[in-house]
Amino acid sequence: MSDNHEFIIPVGNPVKKFPSGLQELYLDVCENGQPPICHQRLTENNLEWLIRKIHKRKTLGASLSCPDRNEDYFEIEVNPSWIAFEYVVNNGMEDEAFYSSFNLAYLDSDEESNTGTIYGSFMQLRYTMQDPKLAAKCVEYFARTGELYPGAA
């Protein structure tokens, strides 16, 4: 019997003004045709660069993680057809959990995307979203607070 549970967290109030400053996080990025960024300390400049890439729907996979990479982390996959993010909490522990974007149109479906991720795998459409501005807000809010953006479900 599986202990996996899925439930939807309702949308909270969108944050009008994000806090300033960044959490101590490190950035890893794989982008088509570009050299990878490996465990680079997150700065305002590389956060702004990542947000621009998300807005333009550039095909990439990015991760924001703690310095030792063994704790909580936030990942985003972007391609022209869809965007998906995942926030993993208590990585590797008994109470590990993950939170992800979702697409209401595919919530009860196992259908996969017809375009792969930057890593070559396919994404279940239930875990995707279409709004690059909202996806960028989710990334920026996590980078500044270490928490999920309350304006997204």
Regions found by a protein language model. Name each.
Residues C66-I83:
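Short, structured protein-protein interaction patches enriched in aromatics and acidic/basic residues
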Residues K58-S63:
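Short, hydrophobic/aromatic-rich segments at coil-to-beta transitions
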Residues M1-H55, E77-V78, A84-A153:
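Acidic, proline/glycine-rich low-complexity IDRs
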